[in-house]
């Protein structure tokens, strides 16, 4: 949907999904993805709601401002974080290192959320009741697709797919995993089997809260404040089950990373460090270009 996707993708599209997917694309594709991030976000919005001409022009202008801000202010910070992460990986990771990485990137996400709220609150105030209904319908369809792909397969098939995906993410940084390393990755999925269902329920709660805010607050400061809180602290609408599931997932992934770190070959560790420095350099080059 327009609201959720724009909120989430300042850190994702504008930062090129750092540490999640940027290593899966070459530097040329990285440049194209970033240079056209605002256009891509605007195109994505049409999946969720049909904007009138004035709204579409306003959205484009606001995305242009977000893009320019992110390029000059945020990309250098992401580059610094990647270089610091490379240094920590090179000397072997500790739990404190992983906690630092999580905290650092969460802080950048919160900053991005605040910027999104500032730009989008005025536009959200212009959405008609029918446009809000379009967004609600898109939410329902997206959730149905999520349930079909993430919940409907049998437990064994779902666990296998989650393992395949997670191993692929790791191998994008390390290169081919050894059988023992793959087995360590495989243990994460069954230990966090409840997460997809909890995630779907959290999506629904978050979406309902977002639409409720858009309908309830009809002045820019009030809507902006509510939107900022929701984007900066999405767990504010979470229930205990989701909070426990997220904590368990974070613990499992943290321990997986620590266990893998102890088994990395010299070549694998060098590959991770090289990838981190490479993407840091590309982000600095992008930041140096005129907006």
Predicted regions and their residues:
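Short, structured motif recognition centered on aromatic/hydrophobic residues
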Residues: 41, 45, 58-59, 116-127, ...
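Extended amphipathic alpha-helical interaction segments
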Residues: 118-238
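C-terminal motif of bacterial Sec signal peptides marking the signal peptidase cleavage site
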Residues: 18-21
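Extended, structured, electrostatic nucleic-acid-contact surfaces
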Residues: 28-48, 109, 113-121, 153-174, ...
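Bacterial signal peptide processing site
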Residues: 23-26
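A cross-kingdom marker for long, charged
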Residues: 28-33, 38, 42, 200-291
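Bacterial N-terminal signal peptides that target proteins for export
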Residues: 1-11
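Post-signal-peptide N-terminal segment of Sec-exported extracytoplasmic proteins
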Residues: 37-72
